[in-house]
Amino acid sequence: YHATTRPVPVEREATHRAISLAEIADVPLTIVHVSNGEATEEIMRARQRGLKVFAETCPQYITLTAEDLDRDGFDGAKYVCSPPPRTSQEWPKIWDGIEHGVFDIFSSDHCPFRFNDSAGKDAPGARQSFRNIPNGIPGVETRLPILFSEGVVKKRISLERFAEITSTNHARLYGLYPRKGSIVVGADADIA
């Protein structure tokens, strides 16, 4: 029921509401964990009106679906995150946003839980109600390989775009550029 209780229209409305409040307060806004095309459209409309709205998405929204939440046994609990993964029909919309600059940054939403731990996904009470399953999935170690293999290798995005949304734009958005996010004389040489 996790995906059913968090449908696309709710995310779209929350995106619209956050943008409206940022507009009233006259402040920039970063919308994180965008999982669908309707929320993406809200972001594009706000930008067309001249608002400073930035956007982020994560690996689970280009690789997982709501069906993963229904895997046999209790394995679906491993994929509980919010917003939940959507249908695979949303993937092209997210990829289009990645390719064409709607998404400024690509992050991990890293929030892992040990499956069998007392506070983990299969903790006491979790099987009685999906509401008791901790929200979050690991991602820091898979963010770059997933975007590279699914994006660059499959020619959905360029290598330059990969660098922008995984490094350069993060540094710009958080005021660290050009010391971070660039390979130039005088910048930090923290490349792996």
Positions of predicted regions on the chain:
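Histidine/acidic residue-rich metal-binding segments in metalloenzymes
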Residues: 1-106, 111-114
